Amino acid sequence: MSYPQGYLYQPSASLALYSCPAYSTTVISGPRTDELGRSPSGSAFSPYAGSTAFTASSAGFNSPLQYSGDPAAAFTSYVGSPYDHSAGMAGSLGYHPYAAPLGTYPYGDPAYRKNATRDATATLKAWLNEHRKNPYPTKGEKIMLAIITKMTLTQVSTWFANARRRLKKENKMTWTPRNRSEDEEDDENIDLEKNEEDDPRKLEEKGDQDGDAGDQKRSPSAVDFDRLEGEVRQGKELDQTRSDSEQNEVEERNDLLSKNSAPPTSPLCPPDQSPQAQEDQNLHRHTVHNHHHQSIQQLHHHSHQSHPLDLVHRNALVQHGPVTNNATSVIHSPPASTSKPKLWSLAEIATSSDKVKESSDAAAVAGTTPAQSMVVSASSPSRSPSAQCHFPSNTVLSRPLYYSNPFYPGYTNYGTFSHLHSHHGPSTTSPTVNSTHHFSGINQTVLNRAEALAKECKLRSQSQADLNKDTPYEMKKGMSSI
């Protein structure tokens, strides 16, 4: 790299092992021709030993330097240490090679001073005294002060941060502290944080201000969050109680299954209890739950008025005429099987053919006369246990008790599944339309226990109790009307 005329290239000792000797300005400002010797690197003043720049005289190069004609002398004086000057170079040394710099800032030194001068400090102090009420210079003011004081922007910001910290320590603070602004540098922020930690009084004042601001800034979103949190907590408590009730219900179902598997006749439908006593007990239950019936019928009126199974039920009653209990006994069995969920067990599928066969037998027996059907259902508990226990299917507990109709709306959010939950209001077709289903003994017992275990589901248990009106009383009413 070649340098322009008038500029003296002065390499430092850290860059070149053998530095170039200093030349006077007359050497550089003298006439130059293309015959000036150059090194292969293209530098006019090459520091390498093999250069022939000044070892021979060139035509037209009038050098005032007193070089001897001996190349060896020129070589030693050119390559030698700059501190060991030869006699031939003594006249050309106008200044020491490592003397004062030519420019404002020396080569290799940092562009700015590390410490501020007195003039710069005085300028910054004057600005600080003028702005004692707000000693936070803006970005533009910092740039202006940096230009005036010949300091960097970071140095100016740090100086003001330190000045504010000193004033705080000396209790000469005449401004209100503010939060860290965006235009302040990181070191200034660190200094401010240290300052707040150093001054305990300011910490107390800041704590009071933060407390007041926290009360004032309590936004509606925080209030909504607290409210939602409370609702979630209540929901968890309800889920806990529901899980407990479901666990107790499963235990009850297991107990009932274990009791029913031992004897052929169900202990829930004791054989020693006469049909007349059962009818009296059912009449009492019907009277107790009559007021529940009125409210539930209004709720179920709209959803079940056009239920297809309900329409089938009514049409069958109209067609059969006087044989009303035959229609009800035949119709109640198939919809109970269709109202199941999709989760059927293998045992249930295997016994489905037996169910159909027994249901046809029961229909044939009940189809003789209404009086004979009453006698058969009362006198043969061993042949058809479901006739006494009033189950929708002909096998005792052929499916899990949890999936029976009164349990599903009571303990889940699902609606009704069949005409068993249909509208039970007065009908002009026949009095037996008010009959619901054959759930008499077992469901009433289990529901009474479930009501004691799950009191929070009071409304649901009332709807379950309404569904437990039994058909013997309704059948008696139908026969009396005949």
Swiss-Prot record:
Please note every region of biased composition (Basic residues).
Answer: 284-305
UniProt keyword annotations, A-Z: Developmental protein, Differentiation, DNA-binding, Homeobox, Neurogenesis, Nucleus, Transcription, Transcription regulation
Output the Gene Ontology cellular-component terms.
Answer: cytoplasm; nucleus
- Tissue distribution of the protein: Expressed in the neural plate in overlapping patterns with other irx members, which all share an anterior border of expression. Broadly expressed in the tailbud rhombencephalon (hindbrain). Outside the nervous system and at tailbud stages, expressed in the developing otic vesicle and branchial arches.
Q: Which residues bind DNA?
A: 109-171
Q: Where is the composition biased (Acidic residues)?
A: 182-198
Q: List all Pro residues biased stretches.
A: 264-273
Name a Pfam family for this protein. Answer: Homeobox_KN
Q: What function does the entry list?
A: Acts partially redundantly with other irx members in neural patterning. Required for formation of the posterior forebrain, midbrain, hindbrain, and to a lesser extent, spinal cord. Patterns the neuroectoderm in both the anterior/posterior and dorsal/ventral axes. Does not appear to play a role in pronephros kidney development. Involved in craniofacial and gonadal development. Modulates the migration of progenitor cell populations in branchial arches and gonads by repressing CXCL12.
Protein name, per record: Iroquois-class homeodomain protein irx-5
